[in-house]
Amino acid sequence: MSETQEASWLIIDGYEDEPAAFGVPPYVGFHIRYICGVLEKHNIDYDYCPIDTYRINPPSLGNRLGVVILAGAIVPGKYLRGTPISLRETREVIANTPGEIPVLCGGWAIRGWRHQGWSPLRKNLFLALQDTDATLDHFLRRNEWKHQRRTAEQWTDWAQTGAKSKAVTENPDLNGPLTYEVEVYQGCVRYKRGCKFCIEPKKGVPIWRSPEDIIREVSIAHDMGVKHVRLGGMTDTYTYMAEGVVELEYPKPNPEPIAKLLHGLRDDERLEILHTDNGNPSIIAENMEESEEITKTLVQTLSDGAVLSFGLESADPNVHEANWLNCDATQLKSAISLINKYGREKGDRGLPKLLPGLNFIAGLNGETSNTYDINLALLRELKQEGHMIRRVNIRQVEGEGFQEIDETDFQSFKKTVRDEFDGPILEEMLPVGTVLSDVWWESHEGRTRLPRHLEPKARSIEVHGKAGITFGRQIGAYPILVGMNYLAPLESYSEIIVTGHGARSITGIETGLSIDTITEKQLSAIPGISSKGAWSLVSSRAKARAKNKIFENPDDWFDASGLQVPDTIDILKIIS
């Protein structure tokens, strides 16, 4: 972040994570871009500062025209590349901002904190309960704070100006794994009787953006250097511009607009990764013909590794009814069957093209110990019938008005799912020997990226092959965590071959390592080679070099070292 010398606005991106919106790194959310787009439209200078940058090197809060804090992370999650702003940090920013400088706070976390009783006393402070961008625009025009909603015209304007704003051009991840979350629509087709725990029905009847509008915005983002895009804002990919949203319990999917959008985005050669998010199993199951056509389009246009999150939440009929959940177990199985029919085939990066993800929530009203048994019975049926599920996500309900969770039942359910399903799913989907391309390395030793991982030495080629552990992921939605038992330069790509499995992660080793430079730690990471064997290989190579000899292939090298070539993995893919 480069601070301006003259008075300017400071935009603090505290990140958003909503049921239908990602904005935690490597994602850049659309709401923060709209806020920056307002300032771009007014031609007002500003600084963009992600909260992770603020923690390391906080910019000055003085000499400001105003400060905007976006806090929108409300979905419980474990974050590896960035951490959303907390209420404590929000309070500190407000307290440290000079009293004469206006402060605007927006996002669903702000609304949640206020609902829980947070009511800070400070002049020139406003907590936006509608659209933060429109509220800021009103302030800039009228010099007064007032809750506002953006118009359709403003939506288009700020989306397009936000696409070329500092939230993109000065984003720390722009030259790396930055994924541009684009808003396709807002609201939910179940706005009348939507899931009780979810914020999306509160947004009302869906308001669509046209394919042309979205494609134009993404094209501008590509001009700024964006390569990866996720279709966000959609509670259900299959109901984009659906028919009968107001009249029908199960609106009829419309294959043409989503096909126009997806093919229009894919036609731009600058686009690399394209993913989407949610799907409503009940809509799919009750409209199989239209849903099948849309599924084919998704498989044709999305990058492999795409996941459709299915929010079953609970297979217990009593919980389903008490919480107005969006599908039952029968509808879920029909939807999973359809996605599996077309999406299981693997793509260029080594992953299945499109698979369903399954969400469960604990603590919903009506839940009993038997609820967990019903959930497990459904999972076992799906497994027995041969359905492939990309991930099973289990979380606890947030908010008021729900019941206490039996911790023993919850932990038992969670452990059983991890043992019986998560691990076996990974082993079936990515058996040992599978090659995955474009794994982006993010951290050393631990899974979470820390400030020290941003230092030049962590990114230096000098660390390659040294002792340690490296973690990384492919770019895209819900990526699988990859661990490697030696160091690799961070913020770089590798192709890897799978060597083992955890409950929700895999271990691997890079392909194409040179026979002349592969290190002892890299050799030890190959299944079938012990630490002693690795030292024998390194020693025999050193002796050969002393005699001005080189090994032409792994067979000769292993023979000279008195070792057998491992037969559990293709050694020629690893050593060349």
Model-derived segments and spans:
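Acidic, low-complexity intrinsically disordered segments
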Residues: S2-D213
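Residue-level signature of tetratricopeptide-repeat
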Residues: S536-F551
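Alpha-helical interaction/regulatory segments in DNA maintenance proteins
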Residues: S539, D555-S576
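Catalytic cores of alpha/beta
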Residues: R114-P120, E290-T295, L364-K383
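Conserved SAM/AdoMet-binding glycine-rich loop
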Residues: W9-I12, S219-E367
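Terminal RNA-binding accessory module
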Residues: R418-G512
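Flexible glycine/acidic-rich beta-alpha junction loops that bind and position SAM and/or redox cofactors
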Residues: P19, G77, I110-H115, K196, ...
